[in-house]
Regions:
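Compositional signal for N-terminal targeting/processing segments
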Residues: 1-299
Length: 299
């Protein structure tokens, strides 16, 4: 008899789906459980406006359930932490904050995508955490490895836990637009690429772990690209290596149907949202994406 094809999961709009079995989760139950974690990571595609609205709404509920929160951002390198602190304390206008934090240099995506999150933190005096590292460190570790970088030049980071074979396959799938759970040749990505990617993963994890190392640790809500979060790889993996195990990963989707095998293990829950307007992609990045698509490569 021919093998029976797996039935795709159906995912209605405005609902949370459990990636393990395709059932629709009760929102109150899910977010109450998330509020008891040490860390909740809200994955994003940086250029999609509706995802940032979703992040804000989830953060609002989590803060209601557990007022002691901090919000960590991939967008900011550690060196601008004093500026984030000044913003939270009301010392800067919005324009002055964006200028002083060097937004156009450190990130480059339209600030309007993120401003509601920044204002949310300021309104509630919820600490904003700079999760990223000094950009040249990523290049240096990728090229030379951690051992070549003296400890005092590592921007406060410890070396990454070694990449698993599954993570190598995952990154190869992303980079070359192939199924994340398929049998992708891990050699398609170089050790240099893996080391660079893991430097970001480790930076986010180290800075989150540092925020938790206090007498009354907050619930840390992470605003991070989903490629650093999916399937337990990336930052969740590095957090576990640092002893932070109570980590939730919530992800958005615009798809109404999911392949069960591809979705399994991607995170704790996936929310189906709408996308009422197009992506907001920086011009230079749009040019890079167009060029990459010509070469049939994912960027």
């Amino acid at each position: 008899m021919p093998a029976t094809e797996a039935v795709p999961f159906t995912h209605p709009r405005a609902s949370w789906l459990d990636p393990a079995d395709g059932r629709i989760r009760d929102e109150r139950e899910l977010l109450t459980a998330m509020a008891e974690k040490q860390v909740v990571l809200l994955g994003e595609t940086h250029s999609v406006p509706e995802i940032h609205r979703w992040q804000l709404h989830v953060a609002t509920v989590l803060r209601f359930l557990r007022p002691n929160i901090a919000m960590g951002f991939e967008m900011f390198p550690r060196r601008v932490q004093p500026v984030l602190d000044e913003w939270i304390e009301g010392g800067l206008s919005t324009a002055a904050f964006l200028e002083k934090v060097e937004w156009g240099t450190v990130w480059g995506f339209d600030a309007e995508l993120y401003l509601p999150l920044f204002h949310f933190c300021r309104r509630h005096r919820a600490p904003m955490l700079a999760l990223n590292c000094h950009r040249p460190l990523v290049t240096r570790v990728g090229k030379e490895g951690w051992d070549a970088v003296p400890e005092d030049e590592r921007d406060g980071l410890t070396p990454s836990a070694p990449a698993t074979l599954a993570y190598r396959r995952y990154l190869a799938g992303l980079r070359f637009d192939r199924p994340a759970t398929g049998d992708v040749d891990p050699s398609l990505v170089t050790d240099r690429f893996i080391r660079a990617q893991q430097t970001w993963d480790r930076a986010f994890a180290c800075n989150i772990a540092k925020a938790l190392d206090v007498a009354d640790p907050p619930l840390v809500i992470g605003i991070i690209g989903r490629g650093h979060l999916e399937y337990g790889h990336g930052t969740p993996y590095q957090l576990r290596d640092l002893g932070v195990s109570a980590v939730g990963v919530l992800l958005p989707t615009a798809s109404g149907h999911h392949d069960a095998a591809s979705l399994a293990g991607i995170g704790d829950a996936v929310f189906r949202l709408d996308e009422p307007e197009p992506e907001i992609v920086p011009p230079k990045m749009a040019e890079m994406i167009a060029e990459a698509r010509k070469k049939a490569a994912w960027v």
